[in-house]
Amino acid sequence: MNTKTLLALFTVICAASIIAQTSNYTAVEAAKHIGEMATVTDRVDGVHQSGKGNIFLNMGGKYPNQMFTAFIPTASAGQFRNFQQYEGRTVTVSGKIALYRGKPEIVVTAPSQLTIK
């Protein structure tokens, strides 16, 4: 194998290792991990679409007492036409945990970030 092939293989293995090591947290635990790339798994207690088209999947309680939100911006909402299906279901949300108005959230821009357990 030449050097370029070995380097490419090494890069792929490292990337796969990092992805496999993504931490998994509950809605309550997410607040302790702001800034991390992670997966949050919990029950969706409330679903709402704003007048502007943003979708909110609230976990760990209903709004405004939720512990975590999976936020789907208007620009991505068209990919989640049946978003009501998540209410009452346990889901996993993957992405970077951020803090918005004192609550942890992950911005979801692709269906691959959100799965029903």
Residue ranges and their predicted role:
Residues I18-K117:
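OB-fold and OB-like single-stranded nucleic-acid-recognition modules
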Residues T5-C14:
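Sec-dependent N-terminal signal peptides
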